[in-house]
Amino acid sequence: VTTGGTESNQLAVLLAREHTVREQQAREHALRERDSSTPAEHTPRERETVREHAARIHGTGHDTAWDQAHRHLTGQTGTPTGERDGYRTRDRAAHGPDHPGRAHLHTHPHHPTHPHTPHPPQTGHTGPPLQIVCGANAHHSIHRAAWLLGLPAPVTVPTPDGTLRPTDLAAALDHLTGQPLLVVATAGTTDAGAIDPLPALADLAAAHGARFHVDAAYGGTLLFSDTHQHLLAGLDRAHTVTLDLHKLGWQPVAAGFLAVPDARDLTPLDHRADYLNADDDTEAGLPDLLGRSLRTTRRPDILKIAVTLKALGRRGIADLVDRTVTAARTLADLVEARPTLELHSPPTLTTVLFRPTGADDTTVATIRRRLLHDGRAVLGRATTSTGLWLKATLLNPHARPDDLRSLLDLVEGHTPR
């Protein structure tokens, strides 16, 4: 359980990075085992590779990047330069901005190979850092996660039609070779509620050996609906999935989740603090929650979610989802029936983008502010390749057609003539 979709996305990136580090460390160990009896001089290409990686290293003292890389390369054990022992570089991702307090999003994850250390050690590997690849439609928290973890800025693929097209993702991935990748797809975009083509994106991620994360904070509850769950085909192929029931789950904040296929996927979060999860206590059966969250001090947010699931069940939530999706489609039909209004596109979830026919961006923004200032309606705004649109995000499963007509009447009444 997390504070919301933002923290879930950040946690997904953290797990992807830790998975990458572990894979790289395993490869390094295998190389050291293989080459331990056959010392060899570094080739020019190897030295150039280290220089490239060293450019990403955070320096300390007066060392140059090459000084640091060379010390890690030789394992700082007095090993002659010609020996391949101890390939190491400092992990740039282990350095992020500090935050006060105990309940923040930690940017220095504990490494489970040292389960009893009080502070997270720095992980080391010679490979390049994790590279995130996402669409321009991705939530801003994906970019923030890269910043928090000290990763390179995400490669952002244009999404002119609002979804991440497989051909565009393939072109981007083809230019990213020799580095670990995390492909991020979205199931319910912030602007329009659009859903990326998950099966095709999952195929591409697998073909390029990339991790696959789906941000389903908005659209994830379609899984409850027998009518609409097909829109999330391919979600089961993700390594991590973000869900947030404060959106289309009718929960007060916070109500976020990060879902993984297997509890063992959360192993990088393992941490030992004797006063919380001493070995003998956990062996005796006491619950250990440190490996299930980045936060130690947290509210019992799971309680309200558990009560809702218990009271409504799968069918009850599915009914609310279906009713709300139907209301959004009704609103879209009502917009199309009025010559004075234009619809951006048929809704996928419960977000409807529309505006007065022919209205420019200034007019759309003015209408929205007037409705808000007068206390008549709260509409969002969304900028697409075709300009600015009013955004109606429907979350009331009991909205009636007359309610929706009244909203459109208000928009028309506040449109400058």
Give the predicted meaning of each segment.
Residues 1-41, 45-110, 114-179:
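PLP-dependent aspartate aminotransferase-fold enzymes
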Residues 8, 14-20, 119-264:
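Conserved PLP-enzyme active-site core in the AAT-like
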Residues 208, 384-417:
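PLP-dependent enzyme catalytic core of the Aspartate aminotransferase-like
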Residues 233-339:
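Active-site C-terminal subdomain of aminotransferase-like
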Residues 260, 354-358, 394-396:
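Short beta-strand-to-loop capping motifs
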Residues 342-371:
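Conserved PLP-binding catalytic core of the aspartate aminotransferase-like
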Residues 346, 351, 374-391:
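Conserved PLP cofactor-binding pocket of PLP-dependent enzymes
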Residues 371-379, 411-417:
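A common structural junction motif
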